[in-house]
Amino acid sequence: MDMDKDRDLFGTEIKEMLRESIQRVVKGSFSSHDDDPVFYTRESYPGKTRIEELPLYPKGIPDVIRSWANLYAKTNYAPEDILVLDLETTGLGRGGTLAFMIGLGYYEGDQFWVEQIFLPDPDAEEHSFERLQELMRERSLLITFNGKSFDVPVLEARLLYHQIWLDI
């Protein structure tokens, strides 16, 4: 009896059961990576609210935010320039903390898209950054809630760990 072989087979069966369970409950799909795929969800919303057709995106960024975020170099950002980012993590520290969910929001045409990238297994972490990299190359303004003090430092640490170079 080969214990390592049995453990690998058992682990693979558990992962498959987990993937099937997730897909039954949550609308989304797994990435095409044979080894350690990540789970993606994607949903679009109209670019206007239901109350008096108010836009989700304001015409201008208030001066106090512009000053705090050092955005005076460029005065007009189009909705398509924006990428909203939020992380859900395994802890509050920077070292050893994994982002088990990367939440992304962005405008495409008259729709606001929300994507969530779930990490079903820590081994899939490197794959979880692929969509983030793609969207960050296309957009010039990153909006976060705790980005300066938490999300960006966590991302930088995890990207460095995987030797992925991304200018955040």
Residue ranges of each PLM-predicted region?
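RNase H-like nuclease fold core
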Residues: 93-120
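N-terminal accessory regions of nucleic-acid-interacting proteins
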Residues: 1-78
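Conserved DEDDh/DEDDy metal-dependent 3′-5′ exonuclease domain
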Residues: 112-168
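Hydrophobic, well-ordered secondary-structure scaffolds
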Residues: 75-77, 91-96, 163
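Two-metal-ion RNase H-like nuclease active-site motif
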Residues: 80-90
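Short, well-ordered loop/turn elements at secondary-structure boundaries
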Residues: 78-79, 96-98, 136-140
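Short, conserved acidic/polar surface loops in the N-terminal third of protein domains
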Residues: 51, 93-98, 129, 154-155
